[in-house]
Amino acid sequence: MSLSNKLTLDKLDVKGKRVVMRVDFNVPMKNNQITNNQRIKAAVPSIKFCLDNGAKSVVLMSHLGRPDGVPMPDKYSLEPVAAELKSLLGKDVLFLKDCVGSEVENACANPAAGTVILLENLRFHVEEEGKGKDASGNKVKAEPAKIDAFRASLSKLGDVYVNDAFGTAHRAHSSMVGVNLPQKAGGFLMKKELNYFAKALESPERPFLAILGGAKVADKIQLINNMLDKVNEMIIGGGMAFTFLKVLNNMEIGTSLYDEEGAKIVKDLMAKAEKNGVKITLPVDFVTADKFDENAKTGQATVASGIPAGWMGLDCGTESSKKYAEAVARAKQIVWNGPVGVFEWEAFARGTKSLMDEVVKATSRGCITIIGGGDTATCCAKWNTEDKVSHVSTGGGASLELLEGKVLPGVDALSNV
C-alpha cells in the first residue's frame, strides 16, 4: 500500500488557507516531561512546509495515551508538547484547552497569518475513538449523532486537511477518517513511511530477512503468514519461539511463554515456509530466570537440555546470537519487528543488543534495514542506533498492519488523484 494514487502535501496549495493537520504526538512522558521527542520532530517538515508556503494557520490535533474518552488533563494533556514544539519550530505555539466546541472554533476561525495552534487531546472525547469508558470505568459507546457533531466541529477548524499521523493510520478514528474537507492530503512523514514499506514489500532487495520477535504467536500469525510470501529468510525469536520449539522439538520449556492458540498452526506455518523455500532460524539456547523479575536468579539452557520446571527463558543465548548474526550477514534487506528477549532488563538484554549491533553493521555495508516501530524502535532509542539503521518507523501497530498486508483506513480516507 503506497501513496502513489493519493493526494500528498507537496501537491496541495496551502497559500492563505487554514490547514488542519492530524499528527501523532503520542510521546512517552515521565512526570509531565517528554522522554523521547522522535514523533514531534518527525512532524516538523510538514508543519514548516505549510508555514513556508503561506498557510494562514496550521491547527494540529493528536491523541496522547488512553484516556478512553474522559478528560484527564493532569495525566494526558498535550500542553507539554506545545513547549517542545515551540523550541523545535522556533516560533510560538498557541495551546487550546479543548479540541472541539465554539471556543475552539472561534479561536481557529480567523487567526493571524502564520499562526500555529495545538489542540488538546482528541481522546478526551469518546467521539474520537467511538468507544471508551466512563469516569467509573464502565465501557461506553459514543452516540452516532454526537460522533457526527464532533467530526463537523473538527472540520470547521481548517480549509484543507493533512494527515501526517502514520502511527495512527491503522485506526478508523474520527480525526483520521471523519474530517469532511474537499482536499485531504498525506503529509511528508506519512509519505516517507509508506514509501519505505511499499518498496520493501513490493520490490525488495534480496536476500530479504524478516526478524520477528515479541511474545504471542497468535498475535503474529497474520504477520508470519504474509511475510512467508515475501522473504527469503526468517528469524523467529522472543517469547513466541518457545511455542514453536515445544511443538516442533517437543522441548521442555518450563514456565516460559506458551501460546495454546498459536501452537495449533505452527506446523502449517512451517509447511508454508518449506513450500516457499524460506529458511527459518529459531533460537538454540537461552538465558533463563527463576521468575519474571528484573533481579531473578539466572541460568542457561539449550533446546536439547530443556528449561527446568519453574524456570523460564527470557533471552536467547550466545549460540543463538551467532546463528542470528549469520542470517543478518547474508541479507541485503532486513525488516525487524519485535525484540528477541526482555531487553528492558539488563540481565536479559544481551540477545537483542547483539542482534542490534549486527543490524547496524549490516546497514553500514549497504543493507537496507527497517525497524518496525513499537518495542523495537524503543531499542533503537535505548542504544542510540536510530541514525545507524535505514529507517525506524514511528508506528508500531501501523507498520505491523502494513507488514500483514492490510489496508490502512487513515490512508484510504485521503483524496484520490
From Swiss-Prot:
This is Phosphoglycerate kinase 1. The modification N6-succinyllysine is found at residues 6, 48, 191. The modification N6-(2-hydroxyisobutyryl)lysine is found at residues 97, 216, 220, 323. Keywords: Acetylation, ATP-binding, Cytoplasm, Glycolysis, Hydroxylation, Kinase, Magnesium, Metal-binding, Mitochondrion, Nucleotide-binding, Phosphoprotein, Transferase. AMP binds at residues 215-216, 220, 239, 313, 344. InterPro entries: Phosphoglycerate_kinase, Phosphoglycerate_kinase_CS, Phosphoglycerate_kinase_N, Phosphoglycerate_kinase_sf. It catalyses: (2R)-3-phosphoglycerate + ATP = (2R)-3-phospho-glyceroyl phosphate + ADP; L-seryl-[protein] + ATP = O-phospho-L-seryl-[protein] + ADP + H(+). Residues 38-43 are annotated as: Mitochondrial targeting region exposed following cis-trans isomerization by PIN1 and recognized by the TOM complex for mitochondrial translocation of the protein. SUPFAM superfamilies: Phosphoglycerate kinase. Mg(2+) binds at residues 215, 218-219, 375. Its cofactor is Mg(2+). It comes from the Eukaryota. ADP binds at residues 214, 238, 343. ATP binds at residues 215, 220, 239, 313, 344, 375-376. Transmembrane segments: none annotated. Monomer. Interacts with kinase MAPK1/ERK2; the interaction is direct, occurs under hypoxic conditions, and promotes its interaction with PIN1. Interacts with peptidyl-prolyl cis-trans isomerase PIN1; the interaction is direct, occurs under hypoxic conditions, and targets the protein to the mitochondrion by promoting interactions with the TOM complex. Interacts with mitochondrial circRNA mcPGK1 (via its 2nd stem-loop); the interaction is direct and targets the protein to the mitochondrion by promoting interactions with the TOM complex. The modification N-acetylserine is found at residue 2. Belongs to the phosphoglycerate kinase family. One of its GO terms (cellular component) is cytosol. It holds the Pfam family PGK. CDP binds at residues 214, 219, 238, 338, 340, 343.
